[in-house]
A protein has these predicted regions:
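Start-transfer (signal-anchor) and selected internal transmembrane alpha helices
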Residues: 1-26
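Membrane-helix interface segments
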Residues: 81-84, 108-116
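Extracytoplasmic catalytic/substrate-binding loops of multi-pass membrane glycan-assembly enzymes
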Residues: 31-46, 59-74, 81-84
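Hydrophobic alpha-helical transmembrane segments
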Residues: 16-17, 70, 88, 115-119
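Membrane-water interface at transmembrane helix exits
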Residues: 26, 30, 76, 80, ...
Length: 132
């Protein structure tokens, strides 16, 4: 089993770590009955409204930028009315963050590090108040 995991590309292992942690800690996960995050619901509504033909800042209003709404609108296309698409965006963002952190740690250490060194910082971030 260990040999099989070590053959997977590093990004795939980081994505798997991100998916497991976010499935447990993010309210966008199907493991939660509903997502009560006010901002996420606003962004999701704005994005779906924008893709539904409404004009931002005239028909619907919030003070964030249109790129954020576009991302959430695309997530709405992937997941319908639930937050599966948003969870996919979160997994992509966390994987990018972990990969960048791992590469930075490798540059500072001067050697190649195991992907699993990122498990503790990833778990700490996913369990923080940012995901509550």
């Amino acid at each position: 089993m260990k040999k099989t995991l070590s053959r997977l590309p590093r990004v795939v292992r980081l994505a798997a770590l991100s998916a497991v942690l976010l499935a447990l800690c993010s309210k966008s996960s199907p493991l939660y009955a509903f997502n009560d995050w006010m901002d996420a619901n606003i962004f999701f509504t704005m994005g779906r409204s924008m893709l539904g033909g409404r004009v931002l800042y005239r028909d619907v209003f919030d003070h964030k930028g249109p790129v954020l709404y576009l991302l959430y609108g695309l997530a709405g296309l992937a997941g319908g009315t639930d937050f599966r698409g948003v969870l996919m965006l979160e997994i992509i963002a966390m994987t990018s963050f972990l990969y960048t952190g791992l590469r930075t740690a490798e540059l500072l250490a001067g050697r190649r590090l195991s992907v699993w060194w990122m498990a503790l910082p990833a778990a700490g971030m996913a369990a923080s108040r940012a995901f509550s």
